[in-house]
Amino acid sequence: MAGRRLARASISAVGVWLLCALGLQATEAELPSAPAELPGGAACLSRFTSGVPSFVLDTEASVSNGATFLGSPTARRGWDCVRSCCTTQNCNLALVELQPDGGEDAISACFLMNCLYEQNFVCKFAPKEGFINYLTQELYRSYRELRTRGFGGSRIPRIWMGIDLKVQLQKPLVLNEADNTDWHLLQGDSDVRVERKRPEEVELWGLKEGTYLFQLTRTDSDQPEETANLTITVLTAKQTEDYCLASYKVGRCRGSFPRWYYDPKEQICKSFTFGGCLGNKNNYLREEECMLACKDVQGISPKRHHPVCSGSCHATQFRCSNGCCIDGFLECDDTPDCPDGSDEATCEKYTSGFDELQNIHFLSDKGYCAELPDTGFCKENIPRWYYNPFSERCARFTYGGCYGNKNNFEEEQQCLESCRGISKKDVFGLRREGSIPTVGSAEVAIAVFLVICIIVVLTILGYCFFKNQRKEFHSPLHHPPPTPASSTVSTTEDTEHLVYNHTTQPL
């Protein structure tokens, strides 16, 4: 009797489980999720933060600072946009525009960006409802560290702070920097020597091709100690081709951003106008960077490499429709390089996507009021005022005389009038982040459905088991005669403080 009851319970449980499995299969068929081992799978999704809502990218300011537009793929949901970011080289920001009345996570547009320029976070944002920003964890940490530093370690030359400085092999490499700064080698050939012959110059001897990581520490008797990291990359001959000998590339997008490129014929850096996307590495924000990377370089533009049609493409390469590989910067340069011409076939998607991103309007034109005060790259001592959105007041800082940002006023009253109404709610990343859609709403429904099915099956089995035990306890004790078919049935059950520093020194 007990065996029959348990068998009936098992059949019922199996029946429920089969119904659940069929329902799950139907749900999965509707909206499949990417496997964890694929580039757009769960391992990729875990690299991103939860979405930062109600802010949109200030495209003009971001690209002017060095951010790069990477594309605008078609996507139905926010997390589809993130998956596209996972499979796009250098993508660290997926910006989505929500679809009005489209349901949870339904979107109308997806934009992919690289918000790093030489390891510095350079994207700017403005408050606007209807948008969500998904950043990689690494990028978000970089942003939080930038905010936490306040003035960003202003007594250490900002031109060197946290960046990857490209240089030619020189004996020695001479850099301008502030006095009282100690250099400590963290990574690279230990034969390198740091010498100081002038108060505001440092000489690096023994550099070889490769990468060096230095920690700069500024110590003053009247100020707290400050540190910053500097990466120096001594370019190889192959890298020099890309950074110095390649012809400058405006790109397909129709923006207008001043940049510098190196002209190896005249051995000087020249200005040009960058369109905003699909550039190459001979593209610098500042003339000083350009000259340091390409000092005294001579030569001609490298020959165009033939497509490689065997093996898989590297991350820096463009994959042609027929499977061949070409250098990534050859995409959309008005010259077909793929045998099938596919590198020039879909360039309009970049143009239209960037135009759409540029045409997103936001009400506030006071985004600079939420920026940290910037002393710039020069070393003058000019008293200025900056606006603090946390206190909603203006405070003094010392401006170095060049570069910097617009949160820079000659008079306190001018500062207050220009930034009236700006508060901490206008600072990107401070508002409560949206829920983490590590899976889409369909995947969430699947998970809930599975849990319910498991609970139902376990409840049926448990109920039948205890009911059977109770009946056996109340029945007379007797031992039925053994039969050859009798057997024993056993069951086993396996079950982030942002600060504004009020003391700044010039660079």
UniProtKB/Swiss-Prot annotation:
UniProt key word Chloroplast: no
GO MF assignments: serine-type endopeptidase inhibitor activity
Residues in the signal sequence: 1-29
Domain of life: Eukaryota
Glycosylated position list: N229, N501
Disulfide bonds: C244-C294, C253-C277, C269-C290, C320-C338, C332-C347, C369-C419, C378-C402, C394-C415
Cell compartment(s), UniProt: Secreted; Cytoplasm; Cell membrane
Keywords from the UniProt entry: Cell membrane, Cytoplasm, Disulfide bond, Glycoprotein, Membrane, Protease inhibitor, Repeat, Secreted, Serine protease inhibitor, Signal
Boundaries of every LDL-receptor class A domain copy: 312-348
Assigned GO CC terms: cytoplasm; extracellular region; plasma membrane
Main location: secreted
PROSITE patterns from the UniProt entry: BPTI_KUNITZ_1, BPTI_KUNITZ_2, LDLRA_1, LDLRA_2, MANSC
Domain MANSC as annotated: residue spans: 51-134
Biological process terms in GO annotation: branching involved in labyrinthine layer morphogenesis; cellular response to BMP stimulus; embryonic placenta development; extracellular matrix organization; negative regulation of neural precursor cell proliferation; neural tube closure; placenta blood vessel development; positive regulation of glial cell differentiation
SMART domains the UniProt entry points to: KU, LDLa, MANEC
Site (Reactive bond): R254, G255, K379, E380
Annotated InterPro entries: Ig-like_fold, Kunitz_BPTI, Kunitz_BPTI_sf, LDL_receptor-like_sf, LDLR_class-A_CS, LDrepeatLR_classA_rpt, MANSC_dom, MANSC_N
Chain ranges of the BPTI/Kunitz inhibitor domain: 244-294, 369-419
Domain statement: This inhibitor contains two inhibitory domains.
Quaternary state and interactors: Interacts with HGFAC. Interacts with TMPRSS13; the interaction promotes the phosphorylation and cell membrane localization of TMPRSS13.
PANTHER family named in the record: KUNITZ-TYPE PROTEASE INHIBITOR 1
Job of this protein: Inhibitor of HGFAC. Inhibits serine protease activity of ST14/matriptase in vitro. Inhibits serine protease activity of TMPRSS13, via the BPTI/Kunitz inhibitor 1 domain.
Protein name as catalogued: Kunitz-type protease inhibitor 1
